[in-house]
Amino acid sequence: MAKESGISLKEIQVLARQWKVGPEKRVPAMPGSPVEVKIQSRSSPPTMPPLPPINPGGPRPVSFTPTALSNGINHSPPTLNGAPSPPQRFSNGPASSTSSALTNQQLPATCGARQLSKLKRFLTTLQQFGNDISPEIGEKVRTLVLALVNSTVTIEEFHCKLQEATNFPLRPFVIPFLKANLPLLQRELLHCARAAKQTPSQYLAQHEHLLLNTSIASPADSSELLMEVHGNGKRPSPERREENSFDRDTIAPEPPAKRVCTISPAPRHSPALTVPLMNPGGQFHPTPPPLQHYTLEDIATSHLYREPNKMLEHREVRDRHHSLGLNGGYQDELVDHRLTEREWADEWKHLDHALNCIMEMVEKTRRSMAVLRRCQESDREELNYWKRRYNENTELRKTGTELVSRQHSPGSADSLSNDSQREFNSRPGTGYVPVEFWKKTEEAVNKVKIQAMSEVQKAVAEAEQKAFEVIATERARMEQTIADVKRQAAEDAFLVINEQEESTENCWNCGRKASETCSGCNIARYCGSFCQHKDWERHHRLCGQNLHGQSPHGQGRPLLPVGRGSSARSADCSVPSPALDKTSATTSRSSTPASVTAIDTNGL
């Protein structure tokens, strides 16, 4: 039987051995590696009938051209590594015994594929954003993107130049995202370039559309990557949609499958399908399991499948998204807006922080309002207190003035009693209060008023008495001070006179040695005529008094000139001694009552 089919027994044993131990012992190479291509070509003879691949985890042949479908329409453009998104007619053929192992091995590749897909969408969005501004800026952005992928510029330089070109800064998460995922894209580019026997720059120049392909899916909104791009911050509806012709396909329609990332050549299998699909002839069915049952978001939300209810709800939401496809064709890749556990934790943390801040603000506002309310209450109480005090003082002042005016007026007692009686009688509601009560109240008020007035009068009398006493004491003090000053002046005058008596030979004007004597009184002595004329204003009073006190025969005697011999004649013309009062002694220093009295006594 083996010979009839063209396969020897030895080849069957080799195939069986590779089928059993292939996935466990083979060291997986990088996706798109030429080594995997060689292993694939060696392990699958061209004369074999359509069997499943020997290594379920093995790669597909690397191809950089679109795969032509049976209906003649090229569909599903290849991604960066050239592996196209396969139609559902091609078989992956997983074995039931290795489904769980395959799932565990595919997780890293799936995560890397997801990150590479995000990076491609990001670069495509940047290029489209530049084109939306202007074609020149779009060309600059495209050049920067190619330079970044070719490692000719660093991420920081790319950030700065992109900001200079577009005048829009990138969001803070973009640089860490590029640092984390750009090496994966460069590694894929290197593998593809090696497979094509080209340098990475040559390969990227020839296959630029694979990196910046806008027809794969609607790129992310540029407002998510650039700051302050759109005013409303809403995501625009995707405008680029692919048209397909699967509705005209002759094969029976299958459930619409979500487009999967095909950068990594490793196939995807659903963990729910553990038994391979086989036809009645014993061969594997060419139809693969539905790819939408286990996609990238299933890995991020694998914790949801631990509970059946959440799993069913999640699958219903996912099927509702898949039902939006066009007649069983491939649908554009839907952007997954669901958050991971870490993102949910960050969101909850931010929300909790915001709520705590709001609570703190509310608490502070409440405390401030309570403090303001207490301050208003205290201010109101203090204002009411001072109002009462002011009203009481005003009433007392009015009553005091009225009592004073009535006491000074005639018939004040009668008028006071009449006014008070009239006031109490005119009050409303007096019929409800006994008359005796009003009388007692009136008497008490009158007593208080009289007592207050008596106290005021006593206070006024005491103040006046104190004022009079102060005035009397001040007057006595002033009189004593004036008397002391007068006595001191008299003593000073007597001292001056005594000094002049002791120095009779000195000039009465300048104090020098005198050589002449006044011819009128023969008492005053001067050093010359100049000092005599100078002192005449003060001396003529004494000299005139002496002349009036002389005898009549001596009144007509002319004034002799002052000379040295006049002292001899002074004995003949003795001057009488008039009675000098106190005022003449204190007017000037020229008045010498002591010397005059001495001369008079000698003459008598």
Swiss-Prot record:
<dbReference type="InterPro" id="IPR013291">
    <property type="entry name" value="MTGR1"/>
</dbReference>
<comment type="function">
    <text>Transcriptional corepressor which facilitates transcriptional repression via its association with DNA-binding transcription factors and recruitment of other corepressors and histone-modifying enzymes. Via association with PRDM14 is involved in regulation of embryonic stem cell (ESC) pluripotency. Involved in primordial germ cell (PCG) formation. Stabilizes PRDM14 and OCT4 on chromatin in a homooligomerization-dependent manner. Can repress the expression of MMP7 in a ZBTB33-dependent manner.</text>
</comment>
<dbReference type="InterPro" id="IPR037249">
    <property type="entry name" value="TAFH/NHR1_dom_sf"/>
</dbReference>
<dbReference type="GO" id="GO:0005654">
    <property type="term" value="C:nucleoplasm"/>
</dbReference>
<feature type="compositionally biased region" description="Low complexity">
    <location>
        <begin position="583"/>
        <end position="598"/>
    </location>
</feature>
<keyword id="KW-0862">Zinc</keyword>
<dbReference type="GO" id="GO:0010977">
    <property type="term" value="P:negative regulation of neuron projection development"/>
</dbReference>
<feature type="zinc finger region" description="MYND-type">
    <location>
        <begin position="507"/>
        <end position="543"/>
    </location>
</feature>
<dbReference type="InterPro" id="IPR003894">
    <property type="entry name" value="TAFH_NHR1"/>
</dbReference>
<keyword id="KW-1017">Isopeptide bond</keyword>
<dbReference type="GO" id="GO:0005634">
    <property type="term" value="C:nucleus"/>
</dbReference>
<feature type="domain" description="TAFH">
    <location>
        <begin position="113"/>
        <end position="208"/>
    </location>
</feature>
<keyword id="KW-0539">Nucleus</keyword>
<feature type="binding site">
    <location>
        <position position="539"/>
    </location>
    <ligand>
        <name>Zn(2+) 2</name>
    </ligand>
</feature>
<dbReference type="InterPro" id="IPR013289">
    <property type="entry name" value="CBFA2T1/2/3"/>
</dbReference>
<feature type="modified residue" description="Phosphoserine">
    <location>
        <position position="264"/>
    </location>
</feature>
<keyword id="KW-0863">Zinc-finger</keyword>
<feature type="modified residue" description="Phosphoserine">
    <location>
        <position position="577"/>
    </location>
</feature>
<dbReference type="GO" id="GO:0003714">
    <property type="term" value="F:transcription corepressor activity"/>
</dbReference>
<comment type="subunit">
    <text>Homooligomer. Homotetramerization is mediated by nervy homology region 2. Can interact with RUNX1T1/CBFA2T1 and CBFA2T3/MTG16; heterotetramerization between members of the CBFA2T family is proposed. Forms a heterooligomer with the AML1-MTG8/ETO fusion protein. Interacts with PRDM14. Interacts with RBPJ, GFI1, TCF4. Interacts with TAL1 and CBFA2T3/MTG16; the heteromer with CBFA2T3/MTG16 may function in repression of TAL1.</text>
</comment>
<keyword id="KW-0678">Repressor</keyword>
<feature type="binding site">
    <location>
        <position position="518"/>
    </location>
    <ligand>
        <name>Zn(2+) 2</name>
    </ligand>
</feature>
<feature type="site" description="Breakpoint for translocation to form RUNX1-CBFA2T2 in acute myeloid leukemia">
    <location>
        <begin position="20"/>
        <end position="21"/>
    </location>
</feature>
<feature type="compositionally biased region" description="Basic and acidic residues">
    <location>
        <begin position="236"/>
        <end position="251"/>
    </location>
</feature>
<dbReference type="Pfam" id="PF01753">
    <property type="entry name" value="zf-MYND"/>
</dbReference>
<keyword id="KW-0597">Phosphoprotein</keyword>
<feature type="region of interest" description="Disordered">
    <location>
        <begin position="229"/>
        <end position="265"/>
    </location>
</feature>
<feature type="binding site">
    <location>
        <position position="531"/>
    </location>
    <ligand>
        <name>Zn(2+) 1</name>
    </ligand>
</feature>
<feature type="compositionally biased region" description="Pro residues">
    <location>
        <begin position="46"/>
        <end position="59"/>
    </location>
</feature>
<dbReference type="Pfam" id="PF07531">
    <property type="entry name" value="TAFH"/>
</dbReference>
<feature type="compositionally biased region" description="Polar residues">
    <location>
        <begin position="64"/>
        <end position="79"/>
    </location>
</feature>
<feature type="region of interest" description="Nervy homology region 2 (NHR2)">
    <location>
        <begin position="331"/>
        <end position="377"/>
    </location>
</feature>
<feature type="coiled-coil region">
    <location>
        <begin position="451"/>
        <end position="491"/>
    </location>
</feature>
<protein>
    <recommendedName>
        <fullName>Protein CBFA2T2</fullName>
    </recommendedName>
</protein>
<feature type="modified residue" description="Phosphoserine">
    <location>
        <position position="409"/>
    </location>
</feature>
<feature type="cross-link" description="Glycyl lysine isopeptide (Lys-Gly) (interchain with G-Cter in SUMO2)">
    <location>
        <position position="449"/>
    </location>
</feature>
<keyword id="KW-0479">Metal-binding</keyword>
<comment type="similarity">
    <text>Belongs to the CBFA2T family.</text>
</comment>
<feature type="binding site">
    <location>
        <position position="527"/>
    </location>
    <ligand>
        <name>Zn(2+) 1</name>
    </ligand>
</feature>
<dbReference type="GO" id="GO:0045892">
    <property type="term" value="P:negative regulation of DNA-templated transcription"/>
</dbReference>
<feature type="modified residue" description="Phosphoserine">
    <location>
        <position position="33"/>
    </location>
</feature>
<dbReference type="InterPro" id="IPR014896">
    <property type="entry name" value="NHR2"/>
</dbReference>
